[in-house]
């Protein structure tokens, strides 16, 4: 019996292992700074009708604003900004410190 039959399995295993290692190390080494992210696209969340009740998604992606509040996500931040005025400004994604 020859050992040629196991070569495809070794090659596939090696390729999967190398890919997994590369992706894992890249994720660990790369810095995750939120300061490079763009500001929330608030125009997308502004209601067309003044009587419209906002229906923001139930997703937790914290947004910090200049009023010191942590908003659950950018939709809640944008709706608050629309209701209370442009003096509420975006600071960063993530929790306020």
From Swiss-Prot:
Keyword annotations of the record: Disulfide bond, Protease inhibitor, Secreted, Serine protease inhibitor, Signal
GO biological process: negative regulation of acrosome reaction
Pfam families to which the protein is assigned, alphabetical: Kazal_1
GO annotation, cellular component aspect: extracellular region
Tissues of expression: Restricted to the epididymis, with highest levels in the initial segment, including epithelial cells, lumen, and sperm (at protein level). Localizes to the sperm heads, where it is restricted to the acrosomal region in epididymal spermatozoa, but not in testicular spermatozoa (at protein level).
Taxonomic source organism: Rattus norvegicus
Position of the signal peptide: 1-26
Keyword Signal found: yes
Name of the protein in its database record: Serine protease inhibitor Kazal-type 13
Cell location: Secreted
Disulfide bridge positions per record: 42-78, 56-75, 64-96
Sites marked Reactive bond: 58-59
Main location (coarse class): secreted
PANTHER family: SERINE PROTEASE INHIBITOR, SERINE PROTEASE INHIBITOR KAZAL-TYPE 13
């Amino acid at each position: 019996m020859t050992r040629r039959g196991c070569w495809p399995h070794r090659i596939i295993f090696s390729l999967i292992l190398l890919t997994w290692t590369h992706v894992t190390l890249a994720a660990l080494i790369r810095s995750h700074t939120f300061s490079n992210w763009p500001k929330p696209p608030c125009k997308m969340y502004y209601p067309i009708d003044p009587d419209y009740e906002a229906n923001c998604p139930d997703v937790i992606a914290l947004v910090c604003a200049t009023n010191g509040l942590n908003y659950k996500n950018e939709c809640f931040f944008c709706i608050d900004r629309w209701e209370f005025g442009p003096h509420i400004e975006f600071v960063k994604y993530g929790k306020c410190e």
